[in-house]
Amino acid sequence: QFALMGQAFAKIVIGIKNPKVSLLNVGEEEIKGFSYIQNASETLKNLSKIINYWGYIEGDRITEGLVDVIVTDGFTGNIALKTAEGTAGFFTNSLKEALKKSIFSKLGYLLAKKSLEGFRAHMDPRKYNGAVFLGLNGIVVKSHGGTDAFGFANAIGVAYDMAKYSFIAVSYTHLRA
């Protein structure tokens, strides 16, 4: 059900015609993972006429853009999200410290400043703020508690888009099909 809801969200709100769906797992091989994940995979394979299932995806490939929807349980998903946030923070802080070490690194920063600012803007978590709660009879978007007004506005934007595209009504139609 969550794969179908995620697919509906990707189609309706993001505008992806045929979203690729994967299950988050400890490996891409069919024999890996808990039995409930293997059972979910079999179910998704059997729904190939209505869902574009691409099999398992490992945590280290989440950000590669190979698939559009990654399905997981809430516990595992939260760990994956917090790990990504922590890694991004660690990378940012380490880079800042490295660029302060010597006159040469400071000079290097000045030469790469425009590229680094573009990279920082691309990685800004506030742009992606807003976790959508799917499967409810209404629109619920949770904002990260540590965000600022810009991040909060983006979460409101997600909710607005869901309302604009009549996500609840249209997703019911997709799920019944």
Where do the model's predicted regions map?
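Glycine-rich phosphate/diphosphate-binding loop of Rossmann-like nucleotide-binding domains
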Residues: Q1-G55
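Glycine-rich oxoanion-binding loops at beta->alpha junctions
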Residues: Y56-T63
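Glycine-rich phosphate/nucleotide-binding loop
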Residues: L66-I70, G74-Y172
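Conserved small/polar residues in nucleotide/adenosyl-binding loops
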Residues: T173-A177
